[in-house]
Each structure stands twice: as C-alpha cells, then as structure tokens.
Amino acid sequence: MKRVKTGIPGMDEILHGGIPERNVVLLSGGPGTGKSIFCQQFLYKGVVDYNEPSILVALEEHPVQIRENMRQFGWDIRKLEEEGKFAIIDAFTYGIGSAAKREKYVVNDPNDERELIDVLKTAINDIGAKRIGIDSVTTLYINKPMLARRTVFLLKRVISGLGCTAIFTSQISVGERGFGGPGVEHAVDGIIRLDLDEIDGELKRSLIVWKMRGTSHSLKRHPFDITNEGIIVYPDKVLKLR
C-alpha cells in the first residue's frame, strides 16, 4: 500500500511509514494543542517536499490570517498559490468583506453541504490536489449537528474517490475523552489525538494514534514540540500521564 509522508519529523516512524494513501484522518485535540499547525505542516510539506498539491478548507479562520500564521513558520503559501500548487477554500467569511472578494475559492454558505463539496471538487480538479485539510469539522457540528456526520461521510467519499489523503481537525474540550462530534470517529479511517497536560507543574505536549486503517502503528503516547519551524515528534520517547 502506498504511504503518504506527513512532512512532520518523527511522525512517519510512529505510523510505520506514513498515512496510507486515500485515508481520511481525524486530528482531535483541545485548544492550543497544535491541530491547525499539524494540518498546515502536512499540507505545506506535501507541496514543497513531495510535489503533492494541497488544499486547505478554512472553516474557522480568515484566509488572510491563515497565510500570516503559516508565514510565521517560514511557510509562504502565497507563492505556491500563484503557482497553482496550493489553494485555500474560504468557508469562513461567507464571501463578505473586501478580502473575501479576492479569494479564488469561496463557499458562500458553509452550511450548504452541496456547495461545499462542489467548490472542493473544483479546487481538487483545478490544481490536481493530492492532500486536503479541513480545519475544522467541529464547525459543521456546531452549525448543523443533525447533518454534520452525513457531511463528513460525503466529504470522505469525495476526497478518497478523487485519490486524495486528508486530515480533518476536530476540537474537544479540555479533559474530554472523546474525539469531537457524535460518531465522527466512525466516519474516518484514522484518529490522532493531540494533548496538552500539566505534569509536575509544566504543560507537556503529546500525541497518540488511536487507529489507522491499513497500517500498524505505535500504540504509545509520544511527546512533541512546536518549534519556529513547525512540529517535531519524538518517536523514541514515551510520555506517561500521571
């Protein structure tokens, strides 16, 4: 089975070679755990290191802010967008505001699953995308809880069907044991959970792979850091929670 390299140092070792191609992975965690950074790094490195065009569906943040946040890590996606290798789908602004008018891909009503999927299909075909990030599916559950799981299933079907590999981020509350959204964990191929826990008076970051269809993987909790160049995972270390 073909693997998709994450572009995150140490992560592919934990996944025994990378994410199986066409898998949709749920990346869940509380506030400040690094979900958006992980997702953005997966997409950016996909383009620059593996020549795999990428798309970020922005449901929680303005595209202008996303570009600025990524630039802080040295990830200049403006150039990649101009080259047709990276695309942001604006599903945040509802097409309102002067900045939104300059976006190439806009979902005017993110609650309309058909419009969201149509815009995503167009962008995938336009740039020949191989990687997709949706940040975050939690927004779907907040806006339309009854239809959200169906929308996640539809997105998975479209993304996998078009040969792409994806990360869906999902917000959970501090201390929550689930993965965010009722039943969403059953709609995806893999689950990676990011945590931020206080240990001996200090906040420590860690991640654990709960499931990953198509591959074996580490069952241990591994520490990771967020540096000025992105996330680094330590596959040879294990973090024990008290």
From Swiss-Prot:
**What cystine pairs are annotated?**
none
Q: What InterPro entries does the record tag this protein with? A: KaiC-like_dom (IPR014774), KaiC_dom (IPR010624), P-loop_NTPase (IPR027417), UPF0273_KaiC-like (IPR022475)
SUPFAM superfamilies, per the entry? P-loop containing nucleoside triphosphate hydrolases (SSF52540)
Name the domain of life this protein comes from: Archaea
Positions that bind ATP: 29-36
Q: Which UniProt keywords apply?
A: ATP-binding, Nucleotide-binding
Q: Name one GO molecular function term.
A: ATP binding
Query: Is-annotated flag, keyword Nucleotide-binding?
Result: yes
Residues covered by the KaiC domain: 2-242
Pfam families per the UniProt record, alphabetical: ATPase
**Record-stated family:** Belongs to the UPF0273 family.
Q: How is this protein named in the record?
A: UPF0273 protein MJ1359
Q: What is the lineage of its organism?
A: Archaea, Methanobacteriati, Methanobacteriota, Methanomada group, Methanococci
